[in-house]
Each structure stands twice: as C-alpha cells, then as structure tokens.
Amino acid sequence: MKARARNIALKVAYDGTNYHGFQRQTAPVIAVQNVLERALAKVCGEQVELAAAGRTDAGVHAYGQVVNFFTDGRIPVARLPRAVNGLLPPDIVVTEAWEAARDFSARHSATGKTYVYRIEQCTVPNPFTRSYVWQIFQPLDHDAMRAVLALLVGTHDYSSFRAAGGAPMSPVRTLDEIRLTEEGAGRLSCHLHGNGFLYHMVRNIMSAMVSVGLGRISTDRFAEIFAARDRRLVPPTAPACGLYLLSVDYAEVPQ
C-alpha cells in the first residue's frame, strides 16, 4: 500500500468530563479520539488514524495534547484547525496544526511532558468546579506538601506511585520540576515536568501529597513510602478531574 503523502500534527485542547479518556473506544462508549478522527475524516476525505502523545484517562483534561496522522487530503494546514473545529463539539478544540516530518510521532518523538493538577480547598462542595478540581474540605499544610514534593525531584524509581498491576515497564523516570502554587480563593496548582510518567503516577503522587497536607502521613513516612517502591502503601488514587496534560516537549517541533 502506498504511503500517504502528508504527516500532519495537531495540538488539541479538551474538557475530558464527558469522554472515556482519549484512546479510541468501541460504541456506545465515546473517547476524544473517536470524535476527533470522525471530524478529520470529513475534512480530509478519508479515514485517518491518530497517534497521541498521551492516552489521558476518563475525566482527565488537556490544554496541549499533541497528535499526528498521515493523509492524502489536500486541505492547507493553515485552514485545518478552523475546518475541523466547525465539526467538533465545543469541549474539543484543535488549537494548532503543522506539517510534520515523515518520521515525526506525537508519542515516540516526545522528549518530555508537563502536567498540572488542580486542587480547591472548600468549606462546602462547589458545583461549578467539581469536574475540574479535586475538592478538599479540610485545611492543608502547604509547607509540608512542598517538602515531600521536593523529595521526588530527580531521577528515581517511582514504583510506589505507579498504577497497581501496571504494565511491566521500567519505573525509573526523571522529574526535573515539581511546583506547588497558591492561586488564591483556596485554589492550588501543582505543575510536574518530566521525561515521562508512569500510568496514574501524577494522581498517586497527588494522593500521597494531600495525605501529608491533611496530617494523615508524616513527611518521614512519605519518604519511607517512596523508598519502599510499593504501590500498596500509597492512599487511593486522586480523582481524574483535577489532572490536565499541559504541554508536550519535542526536539524540533514548534510549540
């Protein structure tokens, strides 16, 4: 079969609330990939198959997901975002498009990713933010939380924070930045940048961090849990709704 002429990359933002993650699902379950591929097929005049930088879970959001696909469609790349967005629901938006090199892969060419996790400290539930933050109803010790996050910076074995029964891959990753920011009105954002992340890694780190902030786990105990490389010692995974894929790094791709 003849290779398709163009490799097109897209940057995509989406609200993951109503989708069963990014990765294509079988009807009646709908994922972001299902919706995006259907719209692209209409614009390109042929079926396309997306490769994505990250397979976000159900309820997880993205500001800067990156995908690529091969096509013989002739639409100018500058017109592609507007054409596709006209066919997409309002909770999925193509923000950029560019012609990529044939060997570019949104997944395999990535050199790093940035995630942000959002927390809101509330006295009562907030119905307007419940799908976009982890709502916490007790005071949090921000200094203690920052102290344990600092332990995670560097190249480490993150087995304690991987998904239970996760795929057999190396648990060693490098996190070169973890930053907890107070945004006012009881809102916190935690930015994490690294060369890669294990499945559920960010959400499990957030779960343990919040347990420290609530005084349920001491800073010393957090360090012991991290060193133990045992997922069973970490509290249940934090909610998906607070997690956002912020951006993906590439060596030679415009950002």
List the predicted regions and their residue ranges:
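Structured-RNA-binding interfaces characteristic of tRNA pseudouridine synthases
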Residues: 1-255
